[in-house]
């Protein structure tokens, strides 16, 4: 009996950390890998790669915990989130706080194996991860904070590998912010009706009937900024082919959301994993060919 209770509790913790839903981890991982390869002009050292990959998993988990803690009073009123561990009572507020602290401490322990510049930058990463969930109550632009949070691994990667933050680093971060706002707007379009009822703010609500157009413009800006990064870092043809393929994926997403149907918007959001993968392959092949 005790074993089944413990198993149920650990399952609730894993759901709180979204271990069963890896899409967020992947969307955080791809730009981090882009930066590691660009900063290292090829494959980075194994030790740094391991720190960042594990760190991505831990900080995404921590972000999910603090997000559910912030939304604990409203998730029960939204069909998609009503069964989450906190609104369903499977995880208490105290347990969520402890889990968040543990995840952050382990993450920081990993960062301490890196240089001082990376350690200082990690403090901003923690602040962004904590701030994002609460932005949904004060601004219609929380997706921009999420973009910065999901992209902060980029300057950290440059700092860890090269101890420098060149223009390409900041352009890559800006590209990731544009991409994140685009795909998270698609995600917010799924919950728009529910969010309006409970007072949650999002770019999907702010953009209104111009949502598809603005998402398209953000996707186009992502490609232009990545093109600039490719020019500055002297990428080979493989990278530019990956940009074309990413553009084709964005066009497909626009077709998917044409009617703004919830399931289609969610599918378009999920498909952004392939955008991140394609761009990473383009970067990796550029250095492999070189």
Swiss-Prot record:
Any one of the GO BP annotations: ubiquinone biosynthetic process
Keywords from the named record: Cell inner membrane, Cell membrane, Magnesium, Membrane, Transferase, Transmembrane, Transmembrane helix, Ubiquinone biosynthesis
Cofactor needs: Mg(2+)
EC numbers, comma separated: 2.5.1.39
Keyword Cell inner membrane listed: yes
Predominant location: membrane
Recorded family membership: Belongs to the UbiA prenyltransferase family.
The protein's name in its UniProt record: 4-hydroxybenzoate octaprenyltransferase
């Amino acid at each position: 009996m005790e074993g089944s209770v413990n198993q149920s509790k650990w399952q609730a913790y894993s759901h709180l950390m979204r271990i069963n839903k890896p899409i967020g981890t992947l969307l955080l991982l791809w730009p981090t890998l882009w930066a590691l390869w660009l900063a290292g002009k090829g494959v980075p050292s194994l030790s740094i790669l391991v720190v960042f990959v594990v760190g991505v998993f831990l900080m995404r988990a921590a972000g999910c915990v603090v997000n559910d803690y912030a939304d604990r009073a409203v998730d029960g009123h939204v069909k998609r989130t009503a069964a989450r561990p906190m609104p369903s009572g499977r995880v208490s507020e105290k347990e969520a706080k402890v889990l968040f602290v543990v995840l952050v401490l382990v993450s920081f322990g990993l960062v301490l194996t890196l240089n001082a510049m990376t350690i200082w930058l990690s403090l901003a990463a923690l602040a962004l991860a904590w701030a994002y969930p609460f932005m949904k109550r004060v601004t219609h632009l929380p997706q921009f904070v999420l973009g910065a949070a999901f992209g902060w691994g980029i300057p950290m990667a440059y700092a860890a590998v090269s101890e420098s933050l060149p223009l390409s680093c900041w352009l890559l971060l800006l590209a990731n912010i544009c991409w994140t706002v685009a795909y998270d707007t698609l995600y917010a379009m799924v919950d728009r009706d529910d969010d309006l009822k409970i007072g949650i703010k999002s770019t999907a609500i702010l953009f209104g009937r111009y949502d598809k157009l603005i998402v398209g413009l953000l996707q186009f800006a992502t490609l232009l900024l990545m093109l600039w990064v490719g020019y500055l870092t002297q990428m080979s043809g493989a990278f530019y082919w990956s940009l074309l393929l990413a553009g084709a994926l964005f066009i497909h997403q626009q077709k998917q959301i044409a009617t703004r149907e919830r399931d289609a918007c969610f599918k378009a959001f999920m498909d952004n994993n392939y955008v991140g993968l394609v761009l990473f392959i383009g970067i990796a092949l550029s250095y492999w060919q070189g």
